[in-house]
Amino acid sequence: QGNDIRNGIYLPEGEWVDYFNGKVYQGGRIINEFDAPYWKLPVFVKRGAIIPMVNPNNNVSQIDNTNRIFELYPYGESDYSLYDDDGKTELYRIGEHATTHIHSSLVKDRLTVNIDKTEGNFAGQEKNQSTEIRINVSQAPKKLVAKMGGKTVKLTEVSTMEALRSTENAWFYDKAPQFNRFATKGSDFEKVDITKNPMVCIHLAKTDVTANAIELRMDGYQFDNSDALLKSAGALNAPQASLKGANKAFTITAAWDKQANADYYEVKIDGMLHSTIRSTEFTIENLKPETEYDIQVRAVNKDGASEWTTLKGRTI
């Protein structure tokens, strides 16, 4: 059915969230055996990201310029500058454009989001805009406070996304946002459930964004950053490992015995950590010919990792 597994996905340092389900992966390693069925291009968002978005469209002419949308993955201090111009001419070269600075601050369980006044202008600029803020969470907040132009705005809780978009100054706790909204009616794919982590969505009334800044405060912010792959507990032994198959010019394959209590295995070579390997063998690719390598293998679970087992390998 087009199901697939992706290997060799490098994640830089930091915490990375699978955009399609909310699972968190630690960076500084290469993840493997990642489930990626035919509909899913692997997309990871670094915690702390501020993402500008627009309404679903098939053409830029369908974008609603009277509504701006920001999706946040709060983590520490984050800043983002939103750039905008007429999208048609080269007048931006002579300064006809606008920018909006957004700042997110998470201290313990208090989140503060500041959207500054938009600076600059261009022909056709829509200054009177509503604002939608989507915050990725694990549970509903304890309290929400919004201000526009320094004045507190009363927020009304609603129970559906449709009600949110038709209600000024409202918020909605979406327990399971559904991505599968555009499948062909009656198709098998329409039945596929594609849900992610909860979101708190806030819809603020239209205001002159060049004159009024926005501040949003959330108390009780929570986001589960535990590794979803780590479930087992208990002591781990260093794997009994060996090289598998004949020597080759560009690859080396290591194999090992299955370890009780192991959730996955890691292989380190040339300072690169290949992680989330759930099978008991792994082929390292893109090596240099006629080169000796130290290959290290260990088992991992939620309690920690085993000692490394070191192998010597050589390409031909």
Question: How would you name each of these model-derived features?
Answer:
Residues 203-205, 281-287:
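Exposed aromatic-hydrophobic patches
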Residues 284-303:
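Beta-strand-rich modules
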